[in-house]
Amino acid sequence: MGKKRVMVPAKDVDLSSIKYEPEIVQAPHLTGFWFRFFVRLIEAPLIGPFLLTMLKKENKIDQLLRNTVFPEEPMFKPEYPPQEKEHSVVELDEDGRPEGRVESALNCLPHYDPAKLWENSSATFRYWKIRDYAYAYQSRKVTPSMVAESIISMIEENGIDKPPTPLLLSFDAAEVRKQAAASTQRFESGNPLSILDGIFIAIKDDIDCHPHPSTGGSTWMHEVRDVKKDAVCVSRLRSCGVIFIGKTNMHEFGMGTTGNNSNYGTARNPHAPDRYTGGSSSGPAAIVASGLCSAALGTDGGGSVRIPSSLCGVVGLKINYGRTSMEGSLCDSGTVEVIGPIASTVEDAMLVYAAMLGASPANRISMKPSTPCLPTLSSDDDTDALRSLRIGIYTPWFNNVHSTEVSDKCEDALNLLSKAHGCEVVEVVIPEIVEMRTAHLVSIGSECLSSLNPDIEDGKGVKLSYDTRTSLALFQSFTAADYVAAQCIRRRIMHYFMEIFKKVDVIVTPTTGMTAPRIPPSALKSGETDMPTTGYLMRFVVPANLLGLPAISVPVGYDKEGLPIGLQVIGRPWAEATILRVAAAVEKLCGESKRRPVTYYDVLGAN
């Protein structure tokens, strides 16, 4: 590996000397027979380690981890200095009733008259908001049971819960009818639990939602792990009257960014059925984009909420690490993954977020989270807060995309925001981006392996899909020393970002470096390995996961093929209110260009 590299302490790095190095991922793109053959090779006792060593050498992974000296101590979980309070916000009681937090969130929203929009059809496409459903229920135009019947018929008639292109992996019409009947009764009695009462939400298949099994997109996880109750975040939503339509498709165990699932079939992008949805929360993003439900819950360990949200043209919120409990999810002990909402609008994501938030007792002790807040979008203070906003952009990184259509559209949105609200755009420098990517890969890979290893050792590994086996082979090559080195890098990157956040309030990037990739027909049966595409999809999402920061993807337009493009807003620690405020402003400026997906179900209009 050559002479070792000794890093200067992060606090002494001269940012003026930093030169951006484009991230180039070196790995073959394989499908079909050659992919299956490749997997068998890397799993072989002798040749496998050799091939993995060569791949890691090509991508400088071993050089960064094993031939570099980092003076920083490891940071095994995100640690933050004390943060300033956000401005023009409402504080929420995370120990209070979820219904109360949802009511507070509702009071933060700007004025909206569903009756006017309900009665006057518009040529401009828009998604039905949660407030539209609430108005329809309260005015007795429809009932939750009527909407449930529409959803059930759409699911059954279009094979949405069946191969070869399922959005749902677990669906029970009787269970949906039961929940809808209870909600209908509450409305008839004049006692809805909250504005979320009667709202239909889907749950990613690595989050427990009783009585459905949790498979993680695999063929066997439900055989070794019983679901006896809801995950904590699901339970909070249920207490608000939410109706759960089932468990959604996903990239097996979250180990992929396209959404490919050779076990059950691959979900398709509602804007282009020959394109991937993005992953790993493929089903949640696609089911929201297709109009079947108002929101969904996904998990995000490496962009898995934001990537598919961007590719499917919806909103995806990655909350701060530790902001809500992970209890009841398949990955409840890692340091990079969180549960977050996907919704058709920023305000709907905000309402769902308000219901589900609440740190676990352990994280309250170790992380000392700031009080959760929401932006007061309904007041004049919102305008003042936007006017004083400082937006950070690292231009060479921002522009390192597969097609300039992506960066151009995101830059247009940024210019609109600056022109409309007088926001200041500040050029920043982010050092060691390649090191950051490597540290994230080792962290999430080691944590996934630790979670799955007991079942793999028990013989379940051979039942995994080929692309999952590829990922696990790489993860198994990491050592304890690699993991510690990755955590030293985490501390360095945290220092850089905390220094940047002394100058700016948010950092803005494209959400992904490309629009939705085409699905190779040869990848449907056995999956594929395409690390260069993964590199483009994950280019901008890694900091929020490695550092635990809040981030949101909001749609800003389309490329020349009609594929959605998302803008990502990354916030300071615990600053969900700020990124929600920025996303709401961007959505308002770019919302008129929203297009109806090719695959769209008008659930509320059908009644």
From Swiss-Prot:
Q: Which Gene3D superfamilies match?
A: Amidase signature (AS) domain (3.90.1300.10)
One biological process term from GO is: N-acylethanolamine metabolic process
| Catalytic residues in the record | K204, S280, S304
Q: Does the keyword Plastid apply?
A: no
Quote the EC number: 3.5.1.-
Any one cellular-component term (Gene Ontology): membrane
Name the keywords, alphabetized: Cell membrane, Endoplasmic reticulum, Hydrolase, Lipid degradation, Lipid metabolism, Membrane
| Top enzyme class | hydrolase
Q: Which cysteines are joined by disulfide bonds?
A: none
Any one GO MF annotation of this record: N-(long-chain-acyl)ethanolamine deacylase activity
Q: What is its main location?
A: endoplasmic reticulum
Q: Where in the cell is it found?
A: Endoplasmic reticulum membrane; Cell membrane
Give residues annotated as binding substrate: G301, G302, G303, S304
From the UniProt record, list the reaction(s) this protein catalyses. Answer: N-(9Z,12Z-octadecadienoyl)-ethanolamine + H2O = ethanolamine + (9Z,12Z)-octadecadienoate
PANTHER family attached to this UniProt entry: FATTY ACID AMIDE HYDROLASE, TRANSAMIDASE
Q: How does it assemble?
A: Forms homodimers.
Which family, according to UniProt? Answer: Belongs to the amidase family.
What is its biological role? Catalyzes the hydrolysis of bioactive endogenous fatty acid amides to their corresponding acids. The hydrolysis of endogenous amidated lipids terminates their participation as lipid mediators in various signaling systems. Converts a wide range of N-acylethanolamines (NAEs) to their corresponding free fatty acids and ethanolamine.
UniProt protein name: Fatty acid amide hydrolase
Gene symbol of the encoding locus: FAAH
